[in-house]
Design a protein with these regions (language model features):
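Sec-dependent signal peptide recognition
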Residues: 3-13
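Extracellular beta-strand-rich solenoid/capping regions of secreted or surface-exposed proteins
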Residues: 55-67, 76-120, 132-140, 166
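Acidic Gly/Asp/Thr-rich repetitive segments characteristic of extracellular carbohydrate-active
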Residues: 23-57
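Extracellular beta-strand solenoid repeats
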Residues: 49, 61, 69, 77, ...
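Hydrophobic h-region of N-terminal signal peptides that target proteins for export
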Residues: 12-21
Length: 412
């Protein structure tokens, strides 16, 4: 009996060796000529190798664990008929494809690659053009979207989709992607425990990054440039935004970063350069803003209502038209140990900290918020005079909003 059991264990152990995965080749001159046929012939853990060429196919469904691999970037043309690749199995890899002409719909979110209720997937090395949605993850988890190039041709918001979208998904890595000319570059909704790193999202119609109801996420080393409305972060908690660049997001409703109803977050080491508003903050609490650079923005920071217990420290505010804008006389936030290029105080004891507190909120910023047309008076002698009078005896701006320890030198 023991010998029989031993033989059975050995057979089970050796079974994967005898049942090795195979490769199904797809090309015009191959036995298998279409991608759908290749997937149908494949078994679990096989590789479907798509040779270089053009394949006019859409509604390609991957319903088993396999690798869909392109050789020399074969073109899959959906001919504007609908979605192109749909993954409904765990343990799927899609790699090395050039996908074009996703269909447009007002009732369905057609995507170049859609992953539905799947886990342990890898979507990488894709080039996507002429698309509605690019990569759409729906109720999926434990996957990676890596090194893809997504180039849309969006003109209007109503008939365009997002580059990478996550909906009710968890534990996803989005890394090293380039997204441009879509509606929102990266969009997350109900997506928790995700990591978004080293992506470039630029020249999109609306937001470079837009997420809501998504908690415990990390955003690191991304660049968001020249997007219609910048970046919007809403109704989320426990997020980390580290070492990102937000630049050249200009417009009357455009921000480097919009925070709305965000709690318990860390915003550290980011660059906000040449935006209409560097950070616009609404209803957001207990956030640490440290070691950020605010350079040549219209407003570096706009603090609107219901923002409490936030800490701004060791940031550089350099050459912004307005450093801080506040719409209330009450202040529960701390602005200490920052560098301000507009600070004109002195440091007699040479300890690197100014001996006179700095008031970052100017009366003129208050006036411009109420009456935008007054911006034409900027840098006039009259404005200098009223700013000075408000500095001496605050009436309209919070009298306790001070940097008590302004730094004399920029933080590296």
């Amino acid at each position: 009996m023991f010998q029989i059991r031993k033989i059975l264990y050995l057979a089970i152990f050796l079974l994967p060796i005898f049942l090795q995965a195979k490769t199904v080749e797809v090309c015009d001159s191959c036995e298998t000529k279409t991608i759908k046929e290749g997937i149908a012939r494949a078994t679990a853990s096989d590789t479907v190798l798509i040779k270089k060429g053009k394949y006019n196919e859409f509604d390609i469904v991957i319903d088993k664990p396999l690798t869909l691999l392109g050789e020399d970037y074969p073109v899959i043309d959906g001919e504007l008929k609908g979605g192109i690749i749909k993954v409904i199995s765990d343990n799927v890899t899609v790699d090395g494809l050039f996908i074009i002409n996703v269909g447009t719909s007002y009732t369905e979110d057609y995507a170049a690659v859609r992953v539905v209720k799947s886990k342990n997937f890898l979507i990488q090395n894709l080039v996507l053009e002429k698309l509605f949605f690019g990569i759409y993850l729906e109720k999926s988890r434990d996957g990676r979207v890596f090194h893809n190039k997504i180039i849309g041709d969006a003109v209007e918001e109503y008939n365009s989709g997002n580059g990478i979208q996550l909906w009710y998904s968890q534990n996803i890595d989005i890394e090293n992607n380039i997204i441009t000319h879509v509606r929102d570059g990266i969009y997350l909704e109900f997506a928790n425990d995700c990591r978004i790193k080293n992506n470039i999202s630029s020249d999109n119609l609306r937001y470079g990054l837009h997420f809501m109801f998504s908690n415990n996420d990390l955003y690191e080393n991304n660049t968001f440039e020249n997007n219609g409305a910048g970046v919007a972060v809403m109704f989320s908690k426990k997020i980390k935004m580290l070492n990102n660049t937000f630049k050249e997001n200009w417009g009357t409703a455009s921000y480097g970063l919009l925070l709305k109803e965000i709690n318990d977050a860390d915003i550290v080491g980011n660059i906000f350069k040449e935006n209409t508003i560097g950070i616009n903050i609404e209803g957001s609490n207990r956030i640490k803003y440290t070691k950020n650079n605010f350079i040549k923005n219209g407003w570096a920071i706009k603090v609107r209502g219901a923002c409490y217990a936030n800490i701004f420290s060791n940031n550089n505010f350099m050459y912004n038209s307005f450093d801080v804008s506040y719409n209330s006389k009450l202040n529960d936030n701390k602005f200490d140990q920052n560098y301000w290029s507009g600070y004109t105080g002195y440091d007699l004891d040479k300890n690197g900290v100014g001996d006179v507190p700095y008031r970052p909120v100017k009366l003129f910023s208050y006036i411009v918020n109420r009456t935008p047309e007054t911006i034409i008076l900027m840098r006039s002698l009259f404005i200098d005079m009223i700013d000075f009078s408000e500095k001496v005896s605050p009436v309209f701006t919070p009298d306790d909003l001070l940097d008590n320890f302004p730094l004399m030198k920029r933080q590296e």
